[in-house]
Amino acid sequence: MKGTTKTGNKVELEFPINTSPGILFKRLCTPHGLSEWFADDVNLSGNIFTFFWDGDTRKAELVDKKENKCVKFKWLNDNEQESEGMLIFKLQTDELTGETSLTVIEEISDDEDVDETISLWNHQIGELKRLIGA
């Protein structure tokens, strides 16, 4: 992990990843790609992603996607109407080194532990790196 920022209820983590933005992007915005590292299974209906983990289910609406640059999800509550925060993946390539970095930005609720959230993302991004051989 390259950098961590905690602002209010938002956690921002930056990870250098040794791969091309195109390879990484497919793992961030498709059900198959996300199910390889982020959740046990992922379904897509319209622009609503359903994520499954060990008996837990969460839904998120894909609200923005820019090829090889950014993927933005809005977490939904049970009735799929209200936002429960955002999850944003940003990709950047350093012009001098060619290194790709992935920034994860997640809004968390007051009762969520920031350190636990950071630990979870470190683990998940470790899985992603292992998967793509980075």
Indicate residue ranges for each PLM-predicted region.
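Hydrophobic ligand-binding cavity/cleft-lining segments
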Residues: 1-43
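Short, charged low-complexity linear motifs
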Residues: 10-11, 22-23, 100-108, 133
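Hydrophobic pocket/interface hotspot
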Residues: 24-28, 34, 49, 62, ...
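A short, polar/proline- and glycine-enriched secondary-structure boundary/capping micro-motif
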Residues: 36, 82-86, 111-117
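Hydrophobic-ligand binding "helix-grip"
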Residues: 52-97, 105-109
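A conserved amphipathic terminal alpha-helix motif
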Residues: 107-134
